[in-house]
Design a protein with these regions (language model features):
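A conserved catalytic-core segment of Leloir-type glycosyltransferases
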Residues: 43-115
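Carbohydrate-associated surface elements
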Residues: 203, 224-225
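Conserved donor-binding/catalytic core segment of Leloir-type glycosyltransferases
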Residues: 237-254, 260-263, 429
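Nucleotide-sugar-dependent
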Residues: 254, 310-328, 333-352, 362-373
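Nucleotide-activated donor-binding/catalytic signature segment of Leloir-type glycosyltransferases, i.e.
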Residues: 276, 283-284, 288-325
Length: 445
C-alpha cells in the first residue's frame, strides 16, 4: 500500500522569526504543530527576521524603494552596532533610492512593504514550478502577503487560505486615504477569492461578512492563542512592594492615563496603597500622552519605565523569553486595550501570554464583549470603556476600585497563582486550521 503524499504548504508571512513581533509569533508558533501533522512547510518572508534553520525559508527583499529602505534599516541596525557607521550607510542608501522613493510616494502612497507581494509572487511561482503546493497560506499583518497569495492562486490554481490579523477596515470609517482604500481593496479580494478567510475576533468576521455577503461560510473566526510558555512555571514570590506590570507597546490611544488617574484618586483616600504600589512599564518608549501625564502627576514616583527588552547574548534568552519571566514576577498584570474604534474588532496578542501567567489580570476593554468574556471567564477583571452613559472618569474609578480590592487581597491573605491553564492554545488553533484546510487539498486518487 502506497503511503499518502505529505501535504506541501506555501506560507506567505512578511514578518517571520522577529523577536517580540506579534505578527511574527502568530505564524512561527504554528510551525511545530503543522510539521507534527505531517505538513511540509515552505516559508516566504521579509528579511528583517532571522533565517529559520528547521523549515525551508526564503527571505525576500521587496521590489519597491520604500520597502528596500525600510528593510535596510533593520538589517543594518542588526549588523552594525556602531551608530555612526549605521547612519552613514543609511544616508548613502537613502540618497541612491531617493528618486525612486519620490516616484513611489506619488504613485503608491501606501505602507512601505506593499511591493513585497511581487517578490513573493515571483519566488512562489518559481517554487511551484519545481514542485506544486497543496495550499497557499497568507498571514498578516502586512497586506502584501495576501496580494501575493491571491496572485499565486490565480496563476497556479492552488487553494488559498488567508489569515487576517487586524481588521483591514476600521469600524465606522469610510476609506478615504490611499492606504485605507488599498486595505479595503485587499479585504474585498480576500472575501471574494480566498477559499478560507480567517479573522481573529467574532466582530471582525461579522463586519467583513456584512460588507461582503458572498463570503458566507468561507469566513472563519480563530483565536490564535499561545502554547504554554514554560514547562514549569517560575515561582511567584511577592515582595515588599505591590507590583503592577504593564507589558507591550503604548500609543496616544492606548496609554497609561486611566491607570495613573486611578492612582491619583486613591492617593486622596488610600495614601498607604499608593506608597506601596509600583507600576512597572516594560516595552518600547512611553507614548507622548502617558509621558506628559506622568511628568505632572503627584504619583509619578510610583512609575518605573523599564524600556524594551532585547535578546541577551550572555544567557541566550530572547527578548520574548525574558519578558515572559518578568510577567511571572509581578503581583498584577495590567492590560490596556486602547480607546479607538478598531478595538471593537481586535484582541491584543498580549492577552494570550497573560492568561498563561496565572497572575491576576486587570484590564481595560473597549467595546469588545468577546474579549471581556474571555477575561471574566478565567476569573480576571475587565473594566469596559466606551459604553453609553460612561464619562471620561468612569474607567479610572472602576480601575481604582478593582486595584484597591486586589491590594487588600495582596496584603492578606495574598494573591496566589490561579492554578488555571489557559484554554487558548496555538495547538488548538492549528487543529482548527487543519480542519478547514484539509477539504481544500485536492489529491489524485
Amino acid at each position: 500500500m502506497t503511503e499518502p503524499t505529505r501535504q506541501r504548504w506555501l506560507i506567505l508571512a512578511h514578518a517571520f522569526n522577529m523577536d517580540g513581533r506579534a505578527a511574527s509569533q502568530t505564524i512561527t508558533d504554528k510551525l511545530p504543530h503543522l510539521r507534527r501533522a505531517g505538513i511540509e512547510v515552505v516559508v516566504l518572508s521579509g528579511v528583517s527576521g532571522t533565517r529559520d534553520r528547521v523549515v525551508e525559508h526564503h527571505q525576500l527583499w521587496p521590489a519597491g524603494p520604500a520597502g528596500l529602505r525600510f528593510e535596510l534599516r533593520h538589517v543594518l541596525r542588526r549588523r552594525f552596532e556602531n551608530r555612526v557607521v549605521y547612519r552613514i550607510l543609511m544616508t548613502l542608501a537613502s540618497l541612491v533610492l531617493l528618486p525612486g522613493l519620490i516616484l513611489e510616494k506619488l504613485l503608491r502612497p501606501v505602507e512601505s512593504s506593499w511591493s513585497w507581494w511581487l517578490s513573493a509572487y515571483v519566488k512562489g511561482r518559481a517554487l511551484a514550478r519545481q514542485q506544486p503546493f497543496d495550499l497557499i497560506y497568507s498571514t498578516g499583518g502586512a497586506f502584501a502577503a495576501h496580494l501575493a497569495g491571491r496572485a499565486l492562486k490565480k496563476a497556479t490554481g492552488t487553494p488559498w487560505l488567508a489569515e487576517v490579523h487586524d481588521p483591514l477596515i476600521t469600524p465606522g470609517n469610510t476609506p478615504h486615504t490611499a492606504q485605507q482604500k488599498m486595505q479595503a481593496r485587499v479585504e474585498g479580494l480576500i472575501c471574494r477569492e480566498a477559499d478560507v478567510a480567517i479573522w481573529f475576533t467574532e466582530q471582525a468576521l461579522a463586519s467583513a461578512r456584512a460588507r461582503h455577503p458572498g463570503l458566507g461560510e468561507r469566513g472563519k473566526m480563530l483565536l490564535p492563542g499561545i502554547d504554554p510558555p514554560f514547562e514549569t512555571l517560575p515561582p511567584y514570590q511577592p515582595g515588599s512592594k505591590f507590583i503592577v506590570g504593564h507589558f507591550g507597546s503604548l500609543s496616544a490611544t492606548r496609554n497609561l492615563v486611566p491607570f495613573i488617574e486611578a492612582l491619583e484618586a486613591l492617593q486622596l483616600r488610600r495614601p498607604d496603597l499608593v506608597a506601596a504600589t509600583e507600576l512597572h512599564v516594560t516595552g518600547g518608549p512611553l507614548d507622548a500622552v502617558s509621558a506628559a501625564k506622568i511628568e505632572q502627576s503627584p504619583v509619578r514616583t510610583c512609575v518605573r519605565h523599564l524600556g524594551r527588552i532585547e535578546a541577551d547574548p550572555a544567557t541566550g534568552q530572547s527578548g520574548r523569553e525574558q519578558i515572559l519571566q518578568r510577567m511571572r514576577g509581578v503581583d498584577v498584570l495590567l492590560l490596556l486595550h486602547g480607546e479607538e474604534p478598531i478595538c471593537e474588532e481586535y484582541i491584543p496578542s498580549k492577552l494570550y501570554e497573560y492568561l498563561w501567567m496565572q497572575r491576576p489580570i486587570l484590564a481595560t476593554v473597549h467595546r469588545n464583549p468577546q474579549m471581556a468574556a474571555m477575561l471574566r471567564g478565567e476569573g480576571h477583571v475587565a473594566v469596559q470603556t466606551g459604553g453609553s452613559g460612561q464619562d471620561a472618569g468612569t474607567a479610572s474609578r472602576e480601575l481604582a476600585l478593582a486595584l484597591e480590592q486586589m491590594y487588600e487581597r495582596w496584603r492578606s491573605p495574598g494573591l496566589p497563582d490561579s492554578g488555571h491553564s489557559s484554554p487558548y492554545t496555538t495547538q488548538a488553533a492549528v487543529g482548527c486550521l487543519l480542519d478547514w484546510a484539509t477539504p481544500l487539498v485536492r489529491r489524485p486518487a
